[in-house]
Curated annotation (Swiss-Prot):
Name of the encoding gene: nucS
Chief location: cytoplasm
Claim: Chloroplast is one of the keywords in the record: no
UniProt-recorded name of the protein: Endonuclease NucS
Source organism: Thermococcus kodakarensis (strain ATCC BAA-918 / JCM 12380 / KOD1)
CDD domains in the record: NucS-like
GO CC entries: cytoplasm
Subcellular location: Cytoplasm
């Protein structure tokens, strides 16, 4: 097997596919597959995605992403720390398992158009200015910009099929979900916040609050917030560079 930075095989045989996938996992390289596939997810919920052409990316940290030919976000994904393996069934199946909470993502590879292994070296960190990441850091440094007694606990917390920007508790012990926007917030942001709150309320009841944090919001977003019983906090993204990493605490 070549040890070049990149190894690419188009229309690989099953043996070539197995060899490249195992090589990527063993070498902790980045694996990319263009394929026609089906996807099955089993975890807190269940979902099925029928046959279609997609891009599958497996990163050295265990991140597992499945992209369609539209939208920015993956249609299915698993977070860092997940374990990945290839199983030979009727068709080859990529399996990603998250241990806690237990979640399994299976991708049946019906036809593989291309598989690549990228032996990437990248040790830099991104310094974001005026972004949602900077807003989150400001909130961790000064929680009272949200409200007195607010205690932020998690950043980028996986909830269902999405990621909450900041998760914490208020002075009354309620769980608080923060959806951060560095620009004017629109209806989509409210709907996203609503979905996170609904997921958490299924488990924790009414002791869950949702707060949209942004410099401003549209009139439609304001009406929907009020209708859904959600809240708004005005906050401008800070204009500074930072690479600090906040320590995350436990929610319970």
């Amino acid at each position: 097997m070549s040890k070049d930075k990149v190894t690419v095989i188009t229309s690989p045989s099953t043996e070539e596919l197995v060899s490249l996938v195992n090589s990527a996992l063993l070498e902790e390289a980045m694996l990319t597959i263009f394929a026609r596939c089906k996807v099955h997810y089993d975890g807190r919920a269940k979902s099925e995605l029928g046959s279609g052409d997609r891009v599958i990316i497996v990163k050295p940290d265990g991140s597992f992403l499945i992209h369609q030919s539209k939208k920015r976000e993956p249609v299915n994904w698993q977070p860092p720390g997940s374990r990945v393996r290839l199983e030979l069934r009727e068709n080859p199946v990529l399996v990603s398992i998250r241990r806690k909470p237990r979640e399994t993502l299976e991708v049946e590879l019906e036809e593989v158009y291309m598989v690549s292994v990228f032996r990437a070296e990248d040790y830099e960190e991104l310094a974001l200015t005026g972004s949602e990441a900077e807003m989150a850091e400001l909130i961790f440094e000064n929680p009272e910009v949200i409200e007195p007694g607010f205690k932020p606990l998690f950043r980028e917390k996986a909830i269902g099929t999405g990621i909450v920007d900041v998760l914490g508790r208020d002075s009354d012990g309620n769980i608080v979900v923060l959806e951060l926007k560095r620009r004017r917030a629109e209806l989509h942001a409210v709907r996203q916040l609503k979905s996170y709150v609904e997921i958490l309320r299924e488990e924790y009841g009414d002791k869950v609050r949702g707060i949209l944090v942004a410099p401003s919001l549209t009139s439609g977003a304001k009406r929907l917030l009020e209708k859904e019983g959600l809240e708004f906090r005005k906050l401008e993204p800070p204009k500074r560079d930072s690479k600090k990493k906040g320590r995350q605490k436990t929610l319970f």
